[in-house]
Each structure stands twice: as structure tokens, then as C-alpha cells.
Design a protein with these regions (language model features):
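Long, low-complexity, compositionally biased intrinsically disordered regions
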Residues: 1-107
């Protein structure tokens, strides 16, 4: 396993532990494969295009970096493995609950 997959930065931690709901095939992303809505605890909603690795949040748009919303979609759908150094008890219980993918834990 690559070293990058073993490390977890602050953005990864927030993506895994904060209350963020990933929705697919609902609202603005209905019938749009590869697109998701991520809703935060505050009610903010962001459109994610996983194929283009794009998010409409200010963090992604203005800082040109992979934001917690993009990472949350990747973890929730199983596109990215959750590193083994992450404590399962710290991960949001609802990770992957509202999308067809399944979160994957690295071994």
C-alpha cells in the first residue's frame, strides 16, 4: 500500500468524522451519474462531480485543493479506502448511508 494511503491529514479527518451526508440521485443530481450532493450539519449543500473531481464549495474553488466534500464522497462510495490508522470509532456512523457505494477499510 502506498504511503499516501497510510497517512491522514486534517481534511481527511474532517471528511471522515464530521456530520456530512452524501446524497446521490436526488434533487439537483437526479439522473446525473458521478454527481453527488453533500449536506453539512449546518444545512449547507454542495454539488460534487466525482468524475471531474470538482466541488462548488469555496475551499475547493478558491484554494484549488481537494476539499472535505470531495474526500467524503470518495470515502462514502468506496472509491477511496479508509486508512488503517483511522479509529473506526471516530468515523461518522452515517458514512455511506445514503449512497449506493460501500465504504472500504484498508487492511
Amino acid at each position: 500500500m502506498a504511503a499516501a494511503e497510510q497517512s491522514v491529514d486534517g481534511v481527511d479527518r474532517r471528511a471522515l468524522t464530521q456530520y456530512l451526508t452524501v446524497l446521490e440521485d436526488q434533487g439537483r443530481v437526479r439522473d446525473c451519474p458521478g454527481q453527488y450532493l453533500v449536506v453539512s450539519q449546518s444545512g449547507s449543500e454542495y454539488l460534487i462531480d466525482a468524475r471531474l473531481e470538482a466541488c462548488e464549495c469555496p475551499d475547493h474553488e478558491f484554494r484549488d485543493r481537494e476539499c472535505k466534500h470531495l474526500k467524503r464522497v470518495a470515502y462514502a462510495t468506496g472509491q477511496r479506502e479508509i486508512p488503517p490508522i483511522v479509529d473506526r470509532g471516530d468515523v461518522d456512523d452515517q458514512l455511506g448511508e445514503h449512497c449506493s457505494g460501500t465504504p472500504r477499510w484498508s487492511r
